[in-house]
Amino acid sequence: MSGADADRRAALQALAMLPLGVALGGCGGGSDGSPQPPLVTRSWQLGFSPTPPVPTAAAVVQGIDLWSQRAELVIIHEELPWTDLLAGMSASAILDRDKVALANYLRGKGLAFAFMADLTDGLAREQEAPQLRALGRSIAEPAVQQVYRDYVLAVNNKLNPRYLGLAAETNLIRTAASPAVYAAVVQAANDAAAALTAAGSTATLFSSVQVETAWGGLGVGGSFVGIKQDLLDFAFSQLLGFSSYPYFRYAQPEDIPADYYSRLATGQPRPVMVVEGGWTSASVGAIASSPEAQARYITRLAQLLDGVSARGLLQLEFADIDISTVPPPVPVNLPLFTQIGLTHSDFTAKPALAAWDQLFKRTLRAP
């Protein structure tokens, strides 16, 4: 998914998170005195990213106000502002400028906060971050890794996230990027984890793996690979993040194996959280899909989450990305990821939103 992944990440930086208020039923029995059937529960909180369908402040606020009614979590997932950092601007100043007000607004909605500091090009895992490439720099440089540590320490101190991600889709990086880049990601993430621990951070530290890659890659027929190496290389992780876009591998949501998540989670003690993913609501390229298939995926996803008593589900897109507003050059694979939102780009609902709302109505319980 490396090339598509790059475009996906660009598209996915925006969409919104939709908190849903859980309505609890009355405590008594039925009218005839018989006990009511038990309410369906969930162990997983729900959430989105605040990225908007179009790049305007009004769309950001409108999206947050909508999805915060159907979520408990929010995630900011992005590459680092390397240009400013390596020009000497402090991480704290950058966060004050770009993130503190947003984080406060999100917390005002009652949302628990997650942050992923992505170390490579989310749109092309075989490459370093775009700003580093433009500067002729590399994550393999000790000075660049120091800037990364300073940034995540500032994120911890200024934004106080409940969950703090230090590396994304590590197995895909190992598969697609050079050994030197992967080794640098391992080093940088582990050193950052040590620095956060030494600083007394209370955030739950995590990294993520790409589920389709772990099952053998995109398309049907690849052999199961697993994530053993990732568990060893990122042993600091207190939570195991999953990235999953199974429409690249399966024609229908019902084709996803029942052990799609549990096979990866078995034998390791960390709780699981889906930190990004989705299913397109439209056919694109060789992929055939529909709004109804996307809604069925949401229902199937709940079964997979229940199978691992997951901690959370985060979808980076709440609304579709309006590709006409993406500044050129538009990545060639971006259309593969622009229609995984639960609403259209004008925030009108798709069938998948009703399916999501049904999940949100479940009573939230301890995992």
Model regions and ranges:
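Aromatic-lined carbohydrate-recognition surfaces of secreted/lumenal glycan-active proteins
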Residues: 189-222, 273-278, 312-318
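N-terminal secretory signal peptides and thylakoid transit peptides that target proteins
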Residues: 1-22
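Catalytic-core region of carbohydrate-active enzymes that cleave or remodel glycosidic bonds
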Residues: 256-311
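N-terminal substrate-binding region of glycoside hydrolase catalytic domains
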Residues: 37-143, 165, 241, 247
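C-terminal motif of bacterial Sec signal peptides marking the signal peptidase cleavage site
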Residues: 25-26
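Aromatic-rich peripheral "rim/lid" segments of glycoside hydrolase catalytic domains that contact
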Residues: 284, 289-291, 316-367
